Amino acid sequence: MAAAIGVRGRFELLSCSGPGWLISLSALLSVVARGALATTHWVVTEDGKIQQQVDSPMNLKHPHDLVILMRQETTVNYLKELEKQLVAQKIHIEENEDRDTGLEQRHNKEDPDCIKAKVPLGDLDLYDGTYITLESKDVRPEDFIDTESPVPPDPEQPDCTKILELPYSIHAFQHLRGVQERVNLSAPLLPKEDPIFTYLSKRLGRSIDDIGHLIHEGLQKNSSSWVLYNLASFYWRIKNEPYQVVECTMRALHFSSRHNKDIALVNLANVLHRAHFSADAAVVVHAALDDSAFFTSYYTLGNIYAMLGEYNHSVLCYDHALQAKPGFEQAIKRKHAVLCQQKLEQKLEAQHRSLQRTLNELKEYQKQHDHYLRQQEILEKHKLIQEEQILRNIIHETQMAKEAQLGNHQICRLVNQQHSLHCQWDQPVRYHRGDIFENVDYVQFGDDSSTSSMMSVNFDVPTNQSDVSESVRSSPVAHSVLWVWGRDSDAYRDKQHILWPKRADCTDSYPRVPLGGELPTYFLPPENKGLRIHELTSDDYSSEEEAQTPDCSITDFRKSHTLSYLVKELEVRMDLKAKIPDDHARKILLSRIKNYTIPEEEIGSFLFHAINKPNAPVWLILNEAGLYWRAVGNSTFAIACLQRALNLAPVQYQDIPLVNLANLLIHYGLHLDATKLLLQALAVNSSEPLTFLSLGNAYLALKNVSGALEAFRQALKLTTRCPECESSLKLIRCMQFYPFLYNITSSVCSGHCHEKTLDNSHDKQKYFAKPQSLDAAEEEPSRHGADEDPVLSVENAGRDSDALRLESTVVEESNGSDEVEKSEETKMSEEILALVDEFQQAWPLEGLGGTLEMKGRRLDLQGIRVLKKGPQDGVAKSSCYGDCRSEDDEATEWITFQVKRVKKPKGDHKKPPGKKVEASQAENGQRYQANLEITGPKVASPGPQEKKRDYQSMGWPSPDECLKLRWVELTAIVSTWLAVSSKNIDITEHIDFATPIQQPAMEPLCNGNLPTSMHTLDHLHGVSNRASLHYTGESQLTEVLQNLGKDQYPQQSLEQIGTRIAKVLEKNQTSWVLSSMAALYWRVKGQGKKAIDCLRQALHYAPHQMKDVPLISLANILHNAKLWNDAVVVATMAVEIAPHFAVNHFTLGNVYVAMEEFEKALVWYESTLKLQPEFVPAKNRIQTIQCHLMLKKGRRSP
């Protein structure tokens, strides 16, 4: 069996002679498979010989024509890709073709509503006659006509037009088309079982003709009686004269009181409905329901809506009828028939769309197939005929045999106990695996300039390797993780149990995550900003005065429109009416007075006089008054003081009252409201650790542990001095070091998150509403200890002293298992996993090389130094890293993993710090046996020269990694959505999620005829021709739509969300927020035109800085419709408006991928990671594109 291979280098090609060299050159330029035969130019035969294919497309009629050769290569590559596409397209069509021919019959047999209805909707009489009796209004017909009066042989009929000439009446519904055309109303035959036939006869005991005469006599005597006109309309309904029914009904409506109009309205609706003016009939019945809610009206309206195809409204009307009259059989049967018909139509519509899509795909497949055949003809036109190829192959084989006899080979020697093979030149090495080559681990070419690994990396590290520890001296230095809140490591020399707590300490101090009421509250002092309140003296007030309390209402109130919305709801919250003193606030208050003997009343007097005679900015004194009322427990006064302080404070200091107000809310258990204030405070100033600590406490109370950890991590990164923060330090470190102790097994945000993102990563944007403001005040930690080596010591108590072994046993994540591993193994692996996040935050990534994977967790590292000393040597059991002392170097071993072929730059003979290639390890004769199973770590391929690997640049994977990676399907459309909450907009303020829905379902419709403006982008083809888009919809956004407002209200159905959006949009068509929500609804529904109508409306009314929200939706629709050039224009506009949102960059990258402009896509995915370093979809797509480009180029080059 022949196997396809590539050509190693051009030196082998140059050694050929005769006409075969040009054929070999063609193989050099095209190693890819031929599309038609799926073969390469070169093959390896069963006896190990390399020869060209007999029927190769690269054997040309004119081998000297380089241009044709290059075109042939392009055609071969193109045909191969085209064939793959055709095969995949055909498989896709066959798999998705709808072959269900018995859909309707099976639906009628299996659907529960169809079974209950027993008959289809089409077999039911939806014109079923209904009426409301006069007796239901306490009216007796006998009181209005003389039943004892004799009737002449030729009785008269009650012609209402002759009784009274009715002027125009606003009550008679003369604006309806059915009423205006009453002369031409059709009159289908009434069924004999229609109940209207028996109503008058049974009641009055006379024939219908006699009753008509009596009604005529009554109208002659009283031409303004609404009862007689209603009786006349009943008479004409029995006679099946719709014109007369309408005339009598109009007069009955004219003279009826409002409460009695429904009798005439139901009569009018029945006639209009039977005459096929069902829409007018629905209007009339709705008017009847406005006056009185009889079940007859609901039942009639249900029939009308069923006939109109408004199935949701019909079912709702039947439900109301059943509520008014439970067990009403006709309503029950029709309700189930309507539901049965509705689901059948939905299935048939879906089948129709599927068949239409299949038809379009078949047409496209036929076009591609015809194009493929044309390209195949072009390929065959330049190819050499098969007989000529065979002749040239014979000549080539003869030449190869001559060269083999002349010694065209190289001699390689085994070194290092036959574990490595050293070859002089970088040429292909041919040998059979076995015999003396069985133990060859890697091959070295030339002067150690290139190595190629031939084994998987599994190490058991002996502890007596002195040469390995030599590399420690040149290892990189990490940032100091002991630089906390402006204090270096010496300041924590006596507090190691706080900064580096042991597991036992954490178990004793914090056996669980503290509850909301157990967390401390804080006070952000103005002194942190360099502000100070002067002390009061006895001259400022008289101590003999009656004790006063600070009254914040006497100050001038200057409202800040920018922030008032944050606190306007707090004034009416019932949660804040209780009096709950805050002990933490009392301690802070007394510490600020610096006199614990002063009673609270005297402190209140201090503040009262300070407000009346301010010797400092008033907002500072109001801030102190807020602390006073917090300590006392009067939340109403505290909010008043802090609200006024917020409105009077300069913009750059507004975070002080915001943070203090948020801590008041935390004390009262309003943690979600507190997070909103804290996020706004971070937008003002992100350099205060107390703000992050307060936010972390709020997230802990909300069960958002991952968000709390992120907030705590941000607090630890700040260099601002914060003595008040140290009380929380031990809790933070315990949660970071021992996540399993608190069941923190993943970084998924499980509580209240303010941003929904596309991944489960530690991303600031996930927890903080304004991520761009978080890094504004971060400073670089001190360079103290910059010459020390980074050390990661892993606890090794109770292990073999002769061989340190890195165990890969960890506790399973989130699988609900109660299985407990061995205590030592669990503790060690738990520490390693707990330090993953700490390494990523504190170590510079250029100091790391590779990836250690354990149970799905990845730890980037260059090497691990393991302390050989045990507890008997006085070394602490806890792990140390970062700024460990240099004297530990003598007691450490470096374990460095290298697993791939690595090319070194020419002339650079230095080994990179902390890294050892396998060649140097092999020359020392130190080979380790496979005892530790590690899937990594793997050193990334260098990529471009001098480009360091960090979160902004992932580096390029090696070919081996590409083969193992799970590639992303780049052709799949990934939908993105930029939430309005990213613009600090609360969607619950625009859409009412609380009020129950009483009316029938609605859909949000935007103005499709909105005039063209400079904002509506009508110059784009996709927008101007939106009615003809081939848009397949984005059902994957359904959950996003249903979860709108989920933080405060339960999840709702798609129809409910659409109805709520429609209700508010109907009242406010100029709201860009509502238009964007309506566009999201239509994106889920798959209605591209209606979605773009709403987006045009949103773009027209949205402020410039908000336009990226509708632009991202528009870019997704155009991307889905394959209008990629338009999508690029729109997505680029979104990036220019809001370059700080990662989703905008990611969307633009997706469009470039669809256009197969992979280099541009890489640029935008890289910029996505700069904004959101752990965004997994962007990382996966970068790796897939890199592998695609690299392997594609690899096929083209030797």
UniProtKB/Swiss-Prot annotation:
It is found in: Cytoplasm; Cell membrane; Cytoplasm, Cytoskeleton. Residues 771-825, 903-924 are annotated as: Disordered. This is Tetratricopeptide repeat protein 17. Belongs to the TTC17 family. It comes from the Eukaryota. Plays a role in primary ciliogenesis by modulating actin polymerization. Expressed in germ cells as well as in somatic cells of the testis (at protein level). Ubiquitous. It comes from Rattus norvegicus. TPR repeats lie at residues 295-328, 619-652, 689-722, 1071-1105, 1108-1141, 1142-1175. The keyword Coiled coil applies. The lineage of its organism: Eukaryota, Metazoa, Chordata, Craniata, Vertebrata. Keywords: Cell membrane, Cilium biogenesis/degradation, Coiled coil, Cytoplasm, Cytoskeleton, Membrane, Repeat, TPR repeat.
